[in-house]
């Protein structure tokens, strides 16, 4: 199970043996943001990216999503400074974001070097989304529907922590194994893998939908919460974004976009 890497390459070109990805790919996260932005008619983006490899990967996913959902990136900017923004954000960021008018600022700063300071400091008073601001995630403590609040409280009572994305996808991996063993009444790895990767497998995971895995890449199909620190804003896929198989496949790379063809390998 991959519960650690958001890499799009692992779902499209660098196809590993026996992969099951419970963590969503970057493309799934940014496609959720793209759907919401399209639905809200926030069609003009200013993209600000960091200089780290993971920032560049997130920025590429944002650009792909913008093209996919008919959005325009009016300018791309790279934050490559080592300024202490705790002291200078109000002076430097308005000038840095002064450009042709935009309606949404999208940030690619996975490490958190500058993104937290972009909000409320842009040249135009516009919302911020991406790795900071309105953020697409696998899970967040503000997800409380579909029985999720009870699960959140159980974890908090037992371990004194809130469930986050990494904890959630690790839990989903364990639930996947438990569900497969229960349904197949087998502990054979090949039998379990083939069942999990079939259309017979479904998993209840507190997201309001039955979840399963994409047979070609091993990626878990799942809704993506869009959150701010204290509330759930939306949970794509949204109504109106259609797909011939399932609207969950409007998030991330669909089968024709991936060269992976997952099958069981014993070694």
Spans of features found by a protein language model:
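Extracytosolic ligand-binding ectodomains
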Residues: 1-267
């Amino acid at each position: 199970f991959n519960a650690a890497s958001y890499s799009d390459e692992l779902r499209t070109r660098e196809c590993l043996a026996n992969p099951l990805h419970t963590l969503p790919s970057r493309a799934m996260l940014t496609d959720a943001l793209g759907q919401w932005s399209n639905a809200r008619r926030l069609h003009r983006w200013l993209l600000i990216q960091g200089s780290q490899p993971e920032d560049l990967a997130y920025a590429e996913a944002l650009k792909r999503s913008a093209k996919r959902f008919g959005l325009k990136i009016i300018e791309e900017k790279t934050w490559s400074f080592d300024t202490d923004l705790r002291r200078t954000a109000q002076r430097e960021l308005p000038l840095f974001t002064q450009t042709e008018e935009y309606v949404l600022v999208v940030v690619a700063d996975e490490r958190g070097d500058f993104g937290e300071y972009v909000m409320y400091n842009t040249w135009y008073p516009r919302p911020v989304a991406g790795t900071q601001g309105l953020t697409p995630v696998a899970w967040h403590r503000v997800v409380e529907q579909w029985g999720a609040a009870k699960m959140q409280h159980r974890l908090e009572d037992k371990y004194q922590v809130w469930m986050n994305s990494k904890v959630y996808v690790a839990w989903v991996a364990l639930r996947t194994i438990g569900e497969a063993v229960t349904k197949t009444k087998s502990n054979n790895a090949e039998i379990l893998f083939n069942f999990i990767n079939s259309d017979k497998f479904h998993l209840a995971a507190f997201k309001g939908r039955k979840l399963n895995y994409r047979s070609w890449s091993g990626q878990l199909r799942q809704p993506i919460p869009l959150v701010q620190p204290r509330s759930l804003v939306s949970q794509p896929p949204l109504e109106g974004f259609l797909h011939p198989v399932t609207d969950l496949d409007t998030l991330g790379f669909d089968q024709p976009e991936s060269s992976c063809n997952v099958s069981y390998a014993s070694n």
